[in-house]
Amino acid sequence: MGSREKKLLPLRKRSLEILARLKRLYPDATCSLNYSTPVQLLVATILSAQCTDERVNKVTPALFGKFPDAESLAIADLVELESLVRSTGFYRNKAKNIQGACRMIVTEFNSVVPNQMEQLLKLPGVARKTANVVLAHAYGINAGVTV
């Protein structure tokens, strides 16, 4: 074990202790976004930027009723997509990012939402927080803190 690893060991131990305490305090902590698939979680999380989960959950039934998967979102009419997500704010950027992310998922990831941080971060509209939410709630991978 190198000197850097020895220095990090107490921090790693402390992090695990904090995580254990949080799990005891919040044993039933879940994602409040409504979704059925990893792509729906990704889309809902993109929509949740600068918006409440409650508002997103009002928008997603119609959105996912019309466009339930990456394939349909990738080819959706952008104006129609914008109108469906308008009430979440920043709707033009969100619609563009959702469509771009879904196109990449279809073309580069065989229509499967990636389960690795590096790949998720390549998707338009996806930063670490969104990637952490998807990894944690769609795949059970705790790669960071999600709030």
What would you call each of these model-derived segments?
Residues 3-147:
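Catalytic cores of DNA base-excision repair glycosylases
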